[in-house]
A protein has these predicted regions:
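Mid-chain, well-packed structural core segment of small domains
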Residues: 94-121
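Short loop/turn motifs that connect adjacent beta-strands in outer-membrane beta-barrel proteins
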Residues: 18-25, 40, 55-65, 90-96, ...
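Cleavable N-terminal export/targeting peptides
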Residues: 1-25
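Solvent-exposed loop/turn segments connecting transmembrane beta-strands
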Residues: 35-45, 71-82, 109-116, 146-154
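Membrane-embedded beta-strands that build the outer-membrane beta-barrel scaffold
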Residues: 49, 85, 96, 123-125, ...
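Residue-level signature of outer-membrane beta-barrel architecture
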Residues: 51-55, 87-89, 127, 141, ...
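Outer-membrane beta-barrel "beta-signal"
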Residues: 43-49, 127, 152-165
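Transmembrane beta-strand segments that form the barrel wall of outer-membrane beta-barrel proteins
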Residues: 27-36, 62-74, 97-106, 138-143
Length: 165
């Protein structure tokens, strides 16, 4: 896990941009944190990556809907791959971003969430550190909405680094 995190940090910080980042419309979020922190028996470190396409959006009365796609893996080899939307609300250098992303979950050696189909709801607060970078903190809840026989859910927190590429 440390090797993966070190490699991603190296790429993010030192890999040259081959496109004009200001006009690309593509953001990547790299995050790490604690999966299911509220369950002492099953909590686990996690690492994930998420793509945010700012060029594909829909204006609604709720705000700007942007598509997101991503995945994470835990130290217990649980995996979640997802796609959905987020609604960023910018206020100065801060951005508040709720999101909803259905996805597929594989428990690996981690927590059994009761079904392969899971729904992730998340809130994130980020701070713009440059025109092309943000740091943030997020909290999410993953649940199968009672699709399975059991629905224990999982609560997680993450530290995010978001960069325009």
């Amino acid at each position: 896990m440390r090797t993966i995190i070190s490699f991603v940090i190296f790429c993010v910080l030192f890999f040259p941009n081959f496109v004009n980042a200001e006009n690309s419309g593509n953001k990547w979020s790299f995050y790490t944190g604690m999966f299911d922190f509220s369950d002492d028996g099953k909590k686990s470190n996690l690492f994930g990556i998420q793509h945010i396409n700012e060029d594909l959006y829909r204006e609604t009365s709720f705000g700007t809907f942007q598509p997101v796609t991503g995945a994470f893996i835990t130290a217990d080899n649980a995996k979640y791959i997802y796609t959905g939307f987020q609604i960023p609300k910018k206020n100065g250098s801060f951005t508040f971003t709720p999101s909803f992303t259905p996805g597929l979950y594989d428990e690996g050696d981690g927590k059994d969430l009761g079904h392969a189909i899971e729904f992730k709801t998340e809130i994130q607060i980020s701070f713009e550190i440059s025109d092309q970078s943000e740091i943030g903190l997020s909290y999410n809840h993953i649940s199968n909405a009672s699709l399975g026989d059991k629905n224990p859910g999982a609560n997680s927190y993450m530290f995010n680094f978001i960069k325009v590429y």
